[in-house]
Amino acid sequence: MDDTALLQEEILRLKEKKNAILLAHNYQRPEVQDIADLTGDSLELARAAAAMQGDTIVFCGVDFMAETAAILAPDKTVLLPAADACCPMAEMVTAEELRFARARHPGAAVVCYVNTTAGVKAESDICCTSANAISVVNSLTEDRVIFVPDKNLGRYAARFTEKKVLPWEGFCLVHDRYTPDDVARAKDAHPGAAVVVHPECRPEVIDLADHVASTSGIIRYVQTSPGSEFIIGTEIGILHRLSKECPGKRCFPLSDKAVCVNMKKTTLVHVRDALVTGQPRITVPDEIASRARRAIGRMLAL
């Protein structure tokens, strides 16, 4: 048995001993995904954090995801195995900046992408993910919407509403790098393959896609599509799930440079050590958590 398998067995034993739940994002390393109780997108993981039984949640993702789990499951211990796994986009808007934006646009609703800090969620009216951004925006009674922090997701949602969407100027370092040239090269290499991209991509890339969806939406599309070849425009970690769950389908990365270094920081050693030590533990101050919980709860209630 190799070192990876030994570590995985040790983690599974510790998980049972500690009554822990292991959640992993679709962008995590394959060997981490393989031992998770659930691998999914941000919306699926948020719902799981709120509903799953257990004393401890080990969140294999980045910091804002673990914060969201701590907000939704205040009675559980939430661990983030790689303490330095952050999301640069989440740092592109602060609570203070959002308060100023509200003052500049009185009467506008604030929709925050889940890729934000707890403090920003606390200043927002409702949260969204890439899977439900359109329905969240359309659920609001206000006719103007401040959308933070991802400009690309905000502009994508604006295509499907009559509301005036005011997007922030944030972006995902991975998805914003895709260009129309990347699409052209991939289609030349794989003629006939459907192009499926994440809504965090630039508008000019989205315009060239056959389908646009969240990570789990991409998986469902590949599973149900009659086609057999797909060009996947999101972080390459999703290819592991696609290879396991879509037998007979061939999936190619839109760019092999689409790697989120922060999502890859979590290793099996980190997971094992977190279960042994009960650290690093993620907590959110009650005053912020209660306000952020309202914004997340409104999303989950849709």
UniProtKB/Swiss-Prot annotation:
Pathway, per record: Cofactor biosynthesis; NAD(+) biosynthesis; quinolinate from iminoaspartate: step 1/1
GO terms, molecular function: 4 iron, 4 sulfur cluster binding; metal ion binding; quinolinate synthetase A activity
EC numbers on record: 2.5.1.72
Positions bound to [4Fe-4S] cluster: 87, 172, 260
One GO cellular component, as annotated: cytoplasm
Binding positions for iminosuccinate per the UniProt entry: 25, 42, 113-115, 130, 198-200, 215
Keyword Transferase applies: yes
SUPFAM superfamilies: NadA-like
Cofactor or coenzyme needed: [4Fe-4S] cluster
Record's keyword terms, sorted: 4Fe-4S, Cytoplasm, Iron, Iron-sulfur, Metal-binding, Pyridine nucleotide biosynthesis, Transferase
InterPro entries referenced in this protein's UniProt entry, alphabetically: NadA, NadA_sf, Quinolinate_synth_type2
Gene3D superfamilies linked: NadA-like
Family that this chain belongs to: Belongs to the quinolinate synthase family. Type 2 subfamily.
Role played: Catalyzes the condensation of iminoaspartate with dihydroxyacetone phosphate to form quinolinate.
HAMAP family: NadA_type2
Full protein name: Quinolinate synthase
Annotated organism of origin: Methanoregula boonei (strain DSM 21154 / JCM 14090 / 6A8)
Taxonomic lineage: Archaea, Methanobacteriati, Methanobacteriota, Stenosarchaea group, Methanomicrobia
Gene: nadA
